[in-house]
């Protein structure tokens, strides 16, 4: 049952496995076993290029769901965010609409030059599947060019990991990934604990981070990094999902911090 599987994963780490379905209830166990063993796992696998949008688009402006009114549409745009899509969740886009942002969603291999041509007030690095080091083979070069523009940047999950790689850090596959909606995280800046939603199997390695990076959040389960920021620029990221729906919503303030960074940066001439 699920409890015995949980104990197995806890003791031995995440194993390979197959969940199979058959209408007649008959299975070729040897064939399923061979295919399971043959599967190479997520390491070195770039899945962002598989799930990214095939065509750049502008989000239709729907906000997060609210009782009585449902999904209301944002009618006023104060800022323009370009979201790099590594596998973006729609609720992230809805939150940006809540904060009066126009969002241009671009594919994960869109060049830095094309992104800058859109004249964004800020750059968002989305969540997504796969090994960040594999996605980083093309994403790091793009991101480093964007970092030099001194624009506000905000990353979530895979976006957080790619930001760490671009800034000189490294990532690794975890023995036990973080899955669930009740992970306690300590905000080291405000000295507060947040309950967060998480779904990741890779993590940023703290000892590889250069001095220009400050660790802002840590897991209270295993002390792994849950958030970072660049000390001299309006750039930060978190490993978990502040946009999680129906919750927890302890970390929605991160969207406001990104908005505040764009407000401050808007006073400077960028284009």
Ranges and model annotations:
Residues 191-233, 240, 270-271:
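Catalytic beta-strand/loop cores that center a nucleophilic Ser/Cys/Thr
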């Amino acid at each position: 049952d699920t409890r015995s599987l949980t104990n197995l994963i806890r003791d031995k780490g995440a194993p390979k496995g197959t969940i199979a379905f058959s209408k007649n209830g008959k299975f070729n166990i040897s064939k399923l076993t061979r295919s399971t063993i043959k599967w190479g796992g997520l390491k070195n696998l770039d899945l962002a290029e598989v799930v990214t949008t095939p065509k750049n688009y502008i989000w239709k402006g729907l906000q997060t769901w609210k009782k009585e009114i449902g999904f209301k549409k944002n009618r006023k745009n104060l800022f323009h965010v370009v979201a790099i899509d590594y596998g973006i969740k729609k609720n992230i886009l809805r939150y940006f609409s809540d904060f009066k942002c126009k969002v241009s969603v671009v594919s994960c291999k869109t060049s830095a030059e094309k992104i800058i041509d859109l004249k964004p007030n800020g750059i968002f690095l989305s969540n997504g599947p796969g090994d960040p080091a594999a996605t980083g083979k093309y994403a790091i070069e793009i991101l480093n060019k964007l970092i030099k523009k001194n624009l506000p940047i905000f990353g979530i999950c895979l976006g957080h990991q790619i930001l760490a790689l671009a800034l000189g850090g490294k990532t690794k596959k975890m023995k036990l990934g973080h899955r669930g909606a009740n992970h306690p995280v300590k905000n080291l800046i405000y000295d507060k604990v947040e309950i967060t939603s998480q779904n990741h199997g890779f993590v940023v390695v703290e000892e590889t981070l250069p001095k220009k990076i400050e660790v802002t959040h840590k897991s209270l389960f295993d002390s792994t990094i849950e958030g970072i920021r660049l000390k001299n620029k309006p750039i930060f990221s978190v490993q978990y999902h502040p946009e999680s729906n129906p919750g927890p919503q302890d970390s929605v303030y991160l969207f406001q911090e990104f908005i505040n960074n764009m407000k401050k940066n808007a006073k400077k001439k960028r284009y």
